[in-house]
Amino acid sequence: MTDCLFCKIVRGEIPAKVVYEDDELLAFNDIRPHAPVHFLLIPKRHIESLLTVNETDQALLGKMLATAPSIAKQLGLQAGFKMGVNTGAAGGQEVFHLHLHVLGTPQE
């Protein structure tokens, strides 16, 4: 989708502080963090929300859930973290590109 904010980040048209990237996923720091560590993990392919996920997206969603903890640990969240997905306008979703919020406070 050409006008999607997160698609523009994936294409490098908008800068972001990237904390992880592979062929299918991109993670970057949230611009309005709600915790000392707050990053978003997104699929590079545009998926609007959990409401539009289909069977072909299942492996990618599983990869997102499996990848998030390793990124969190690299950012100092070995003791734990929160994950959340806002889905649809009524669920608080503001950017309509599927994204997983990962938040926490590093423990010493």
Identify the meaning behind each predicted range.
Residues 1-108:
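HIT superfamily nucleotide-processing domains
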